[in-house]
């Protein structure tokens, strides 16, 4: 019988594709949302009232943020942690990006330790941004491997929101690995580190005037007029549906303690 899976940040671009895939494979899914309104919207969107339920987690940062949600769902055996801030217009990088990402990850792992001993696999959505050296983005000799980390420090991250995002992914991921190393938990860990994630919204109802950051990059191109100047932009990219498949494959195929 398929497992029950908890997906944090269930309203997210990647998360919705993950949940759509999980439901199609017969899994029961519990998603965390920031408000009951968002949760009700997802129930209607997924159209699977018997298979999808939600728990309200208003903020990632408060200590014990995920405790209640996990206490209520002893049936969950897999946890997919996708929730993390992406705000490249952040004015206070530490407050809006770094602390929520790192504290949120720590809160998830502590909650699993205390209230989810039955959970056997945790998958965290990280990013290649945690790995590559930004100063060498155009360097064809720059190789990124499972052992790579970006060189951005906590202090460096405050220079601009992009550095802040890169640092948030790095330090949140390091917090996950450090927990596993120090606590020796019952679960195994997998990290998904995609490049720039593009693709359609999971459902037509999620198509809005302004989309999530990565999808909006393409949306803006489609809205250009013949007179518009084409923006310069180059990046490796991956289809969001493949990213969703990677999250599910990580626990189905037992890619244990790998990036």
Which residue stretches match the model-derived regions?
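NAD(P)H-binding glycine-rich loop region in Rossmannoid oxidoreductase-like domains
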Residues: 36-41, 47-103, 113
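Glycine-rich "substrate-gating" loop/helix at the edge of Rossmann-like oxidoreductase active sites
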Residues: 162-164, 200-210, 229-241
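N-terminal Rossmann NAD(P)H-binding glycine-rich loop of SDR-like oxidoreductase domains
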Residues: 2-32
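Active-site Tyr-X1-5-Lys
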Residues: 152-189
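Conserved Rossmann-fold NAD(P)-dependent oxidoreductase catalytic core, especially the SDR/UDP-sugar
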Residues: 81, 91, 96, 100-162
């Amino acid at each position: 019988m398929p497992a029950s899976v908890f997906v944090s940040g269930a309203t997210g671009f990647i998360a919705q594709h993950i949940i759509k895939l999980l439901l199609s494979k017969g899994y029961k899914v519990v998603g965390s949302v920031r408000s009951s309104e968002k949760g009700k919207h997802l129930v209607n969107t997924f159209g699977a009232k018997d298979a999808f339920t939600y728990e309200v987690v208003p903020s990632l940062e408060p200590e014990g943020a995920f405790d209640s949600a996990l206490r209520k769902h002893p049936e969950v055996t897999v946890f997919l942690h996708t929730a993390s801030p992406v705000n490249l217009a952040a004015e206070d990088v530490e407050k809006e990006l770094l602390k929520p990402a790192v504290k949120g990850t720590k809160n998830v792992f502590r909650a699993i330790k205390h209230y989810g001993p039955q959970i056997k696999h945790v998958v965290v959505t990280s990013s290649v941004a945690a790995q590559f050296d930004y100063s060498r983005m155009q360097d064809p000799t720059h190789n990124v491997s499972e052992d790579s980390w970006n060189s951005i420090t906590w202090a460096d991250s405050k220079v601009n929101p992009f550095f802040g995002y890169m640092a948030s992914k790095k330090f949140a991921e390091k917090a996950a690995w450090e927990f596993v190393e120090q606590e020796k938990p019952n679960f195994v860990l997998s990290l998904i580190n995609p490049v720039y994630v593009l693709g359609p919204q999971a459902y037509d109802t999620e198509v809005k005037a302004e989309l999530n950051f990565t999808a909006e990059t393409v949306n803006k191109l489609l809205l250009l007029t013949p007179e518009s100047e084409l923006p310069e932009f180059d990046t490796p990219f991956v289809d969001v549906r493949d990213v969703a498949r990677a999250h599910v494959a990580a626990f189905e195929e037992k890619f244990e303690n790998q990036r």
